[in-house]
Amino acid sequence: MRNYYLTDGTLENFYTAVFDAYKDGNACLSSAPSLQIGLGDGFFRVQTDESKAARVMTKIRGLDGRALWEIDRILRANAPDKEQAAYLYLRVLIESGKPARGNLANPSVRRAMDICAQVGTEVHRLKGFLRFQETADGVLYAPCSPDNDVVDLLMPHFAARLKTCSFIIHDVWRGVAGIYHKGEWLVTAAGEAVFSPSERERNFQSLWKKYYHTVTIAQRKNERQRRNYMPVRYWKFLTEEPN
């Protein structure tokens, strides 16, 4: 028999669930919209309680402040077990009373660190793979479809490098966009984008494609290695890739 605690995907709700479930030896935390629950299993829809969440976060901060950062990363992942992985990791941390990330012999710690690393790897990749296009209005637009919810993790990086530009990073899969203008940025819901590239953008794209294919040495192509360094899911957003 298991008791399922359904969260709404927010940090505060997750930490409330940790508080509610901690003394439950059969707890399973999840934000999945559909769960397969067996006969006799319990089901609880978690209601956010800021006081409970704050108590849990204060406890964690006192043991290992970096763990709060790790939990934030884990909960951004596109992994069906992310809440449970984060919860079990926190149990190890609280029960040991000291940082647990180095205890990779523990499967709960290892799974949590794997998910955390996957999110970090995608952020790192997108800093290099993201392609901005200049619209006719002069705004730079970069569509993407990351595995994980990382748009707001990308915004500070590009805001620091494109200070004088207005730009949009659009997660077309989740329907959210990071918008930067005059030193400030926010992340908001966004539908399908419709825009016209500027004349300069069309010229640059044409030149870049010609350059990319001109410098390619056919005899040295290694598609397997290419896929390892540049996952196929990013290709459709790259200027140099044919449509």
Per-segment meaning from a language model:
Residues M1-E50:
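N-terminal ordered "arm"
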Residues N3-T10, F44, P107, V139-V150, ...:
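Conserved aromatic-histidine-acidic binding/catalytic patches
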Residues N13-D24, Y87-E95, L153-A160, S206-H213:
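Short, hydrophobic/amphipathic alpha-helical patches that form generic packing surfaces
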Residues G25-N26, L63, A67, K82, ...:
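Short secondary-structure junctions and interdomain/linker hinges
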Residues S31-L126:
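Charged, alpha-helical interface segments at or near domain boundaries
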Residues F44-S51, W185-P197:
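Acidic, Ser/Thr-rich peripheral helices and adjacent loops at domain boundaries
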Residues P99-A189:
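Internal, well-folded beta-alpha domain core
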Residues S166, A177-G178, K182, S196-N243:
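Long, compositionally biased intrinsically disordered terminal regions
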